[in-house]
């Protein structure tokens, strides 16, 4: 069987600093009713023995909602990282970081469950996930 790829992601993913290991809690930046997301696993990480899989901007991960609407809690969901506090370097040489870690809930195809995103979305994430870019208020 062939691998299905990155869901709804398009374009090439470049290496960035990974700032969100398994067990991290981040803000939910969409209007689904979830307040924060707990990282359970990171999609596409093979890893090494005893090393925690980590997610960075633009990565899809498996999450659960720790605070928010009761119908969203205690379920395993897919999400994508849209902002991270850990500084990373862009291809043009500039470096960027944000004041919070944030993600949005998506389905397996990369389509957002919500209809709006609060705060900026990184350029790297917007290039990879066109459905997220279309709902973003601003792209930084």
Curated annotation (Swiss-Prot):
Gene3D superfamilies associated with the record: Ribosomal protein L14
Keyword Ribosomal protein found: yes
Protein family per UniProt: Belongs to the universal ribosomal protein uL14 family.
Cross-referenced NCBIfam families: PRK08571.1
GO biological process entries: translation
Encoding gene (name): RPL23
Record-linked PANTHER family: 50S/60S RIBOSOMAL PROTEIN L14/L23 (PTHR11761), LARGE RIBOSOMAL SUBUNIT PROTEIN UL14 (PTHR11761:SF8)
Protein name: Large ribosomal subunit protein uL14
Keywords: Ribonucleoprotein, Ribosomal protein
Gene Ontology MF annotations: large ribosomal subunit rRNA binding; structural constituent of ribosome
Gene Ontology cellular component annotations, sorted alphabetically: cytosolic large ribosomal subunit
